[in-house]
Amino acid sequence: MIFMFGRTVSGFGSRAKRGAAPLSLSLNVTSGDLEVVGPAGGTVTAGIVDFGINITATASGGAGGYSYAWTNTEMADDDGVFSVYATGTTNASSYSGLVIAMDTSGDFGGEEHTGSYRIRCTVTDSASATATADFTLNVTGIVE
């Protein structure tokens, strides 16, 4: 309490409570393109690890106690030749093990195909807040 000129003032002013910063997520990606190369007449695979593509998520803010969930979605495949062969690790801060397959059974050699996949990480903190971040993986398929 403050006494001023015979008056009593209580509850003078207030201070906002400061909590944790909002949950946020960023991705660190080394390299970015995947190339699938192989002969006509079968299925050829290539993984992101084979090309030195490392994708790491960094969460900050929120309530802590982070859990990670990774997904991949085909965004483009003009010739319909690509598919996910293996999803890889989907519940850690780093995403690895994604393998893309290319069907070359209808090719005769010399063809080039392009596609892309959205790699998405969703982080959830211990208070169930979520944040997401995306990366586009470009895929080129070359049939020898």
Per-segment meaning from a language model:
Residues 46, 50-59:
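A short beta-strand segment in extracellular, disulfide-stabilized domains
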Residues 60-64:
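Short glycine/proline-centered coil/turn motifs in the loop regions
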Residues 131-141:
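C-terminal edge beta-strand
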